[in-house]
Amino acid sequence: MKRQSPQLMAIAGAMVLAMAGLMGLPSQASAKTHDVKMTALEVEIVTEGTGKKYKAWTFNGQMPGPAVRVTEGDTVNFTLENPKTNIFQHSMDFHAAEIDFLKNYRAIKPGETISFTFVAKKPGVFFYHCGAAPMIQHVARGMFGAIIVDPKDPKVWPKADREFLLVQSELWNNPDDVEAMFGRKFDHVIFNGGIWKYHPFFIGAEALEAKPNERVRIYFVNAGPNEFSSLHPIGEIWDNVYESGNPANKLTGVQTYVVGPGSAATFDVVSESPGVYPIVTHSLTSALRGAIAALTITPVAKDAPLMPLTPWNP
């Protein structure tokens, strides 16, 4: 057999890489590596909307935990620290990862650290949470958050003019009442850790604003731990809904979309007329306990961070 020259092999390799780029295939050159570290903190925080102190279990002292954002094909090196000052075991479960549960998602004791690596293979918006027992209590007390995996090809869906991240969860006034958690006897349902956090009629509420005809993209995660969310934009219709935030899972012209506990979706809406458009879960027992976020459409909408998720700090 005739051997190929090193020059020909190099040219062939370059052509393969070039074709991969043209086809939008991930390559080691384009993919990035992210070192993500979180600390499990058992802290007393002040509940937004009530002013009451709450004994929370958190990632990095905030509820929800920090938002993680990567691109499809990226590698995530994750480390969780459980400080000696804590009392309970904690763990991490990333719904965006495809790795061994027993090895990587095991609970660690106070004073221990665990690390694992995964590749974000699928685009979307995903839930992450502590899985230590009793998991229902760890989630209810604040150990949850969101990871967004952007598609490697941004042209697979329309470009958003504004992006917001909303994480829905249930809140119990007594975080030690596990029986009430199993009985679904929650006191509030909240967005991003606050009761009526984005309701314009409450003093101190934060604003979700956009200009007419801007495409607003909402990354939505339902942390639960128990209740389904039936997300609806009052006065509007979702232009597009993407199950699990994956551009391949596209629905058009949706009035209300159900997101179960531990699941997520991405919602696009383009509003032509100025006004206020409340975003609610149409499970009214949940909406009327705090899960209402008003989207204000105004020509003078202020510029906002990409994801205006204000930490719920101790």
Can you describe what each PLM-predicted range is?
Residues G73-D74, A120-F126, N213-E214, S263-A265, ...:
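Short tyrosine-centred short linear motifs in exposed loops/low-complexity segments
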Residues T33, E42, A140-P175, A180, ...:
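Extracytoplasmic/periplasmic copper-protein system
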Residues K159-S230, I234, E272, Y277:
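A contiguous, surface-exposed recognition patch within enzymatic or periplasmic domains that forms
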Residues D100-N104, P247-F267:
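A cross-kingdom feature marking solvent-exposed beta-strand/loop segments within repeated
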Residues A20-Y105, P110-S115, V149, M181-F220, ...:
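N-terminal, post-signal-peptide metal-ligating segments of extracellular/periplasmic oxidoreductases
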Residues S91-M92, G124-P134, E272-S286:
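Short, surface-exposed ligand- or partner-binding patches at beta-edge/loop junctions that are enriched
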Residues A10-G24:
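Bacterial N-terminal signal peptides
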Residues M1-Q7:
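N-terminal secretory signal peptides that target proteins for export/translocation
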